[in-house]
Amino acid sequence: KQFTKCELSQVLKSMDGYKGVTLPEWICTIFHSSGYDTQTIVKNNGKTEYGLFQINNKMWCRDNQILPSRNICGISCNKFLDDDLTDDVMCAKKILDSEGIDYWLAHKPLCSEKLEQWLCEEL
């Protein structure tokens, strides 16, 4: 699914402030990671990254390409490509708990300031 900024803001409201990361920071980071498209798959340095949050198959999910995957989120990577973001959010929070927001490389250079443009006026 191709989300809009406002649709995504609505769905991800529960992440606002989690571990000190604001909703606009998440929206910006997701935009620069996957363009709000749940179907995004990127092959990167021998890993494959899936979905909105670009969660990789080496550490966080399994896809039978990398064996063994640590599969910390205990899930098939394909689950990050559907429209239900519940499992994506649960895994993203685990990543945040463990690695911090800078796990998402777009965050520091692109999403640490001037975040007004990432707010949804309708919320």
From Swiss-Prot:
It is found in: Secreted. The keyword Disulfide bond applies. PANTHER family: ALPHA-LACTALBUMIN, LYSOZYME C. Lactose synthase (LS) is a heterodimer of a catalytic component, beta1,4-galactosyltransferase (beta4Gal-T1) and a regulatory component, alpha-lactalbumin (LA). Regulatory subunit of lactose synthase, changes the substrate specificity of galactosyltransferase in the mammary gland making glucose a good acceptor substrate for this enzyme. This enables LS to synthesize lactose, the major carbohydrate component of milk. In other tissues, galactosyltransferase transfers galactose onto the N-acetylglucosamine of the oligosaccharide chains in glycoproteins. Belongs to the glycosyl hydrolase 22 family. This is Alpha-lactalbumin. It comes from Equus asinus (Donkey).
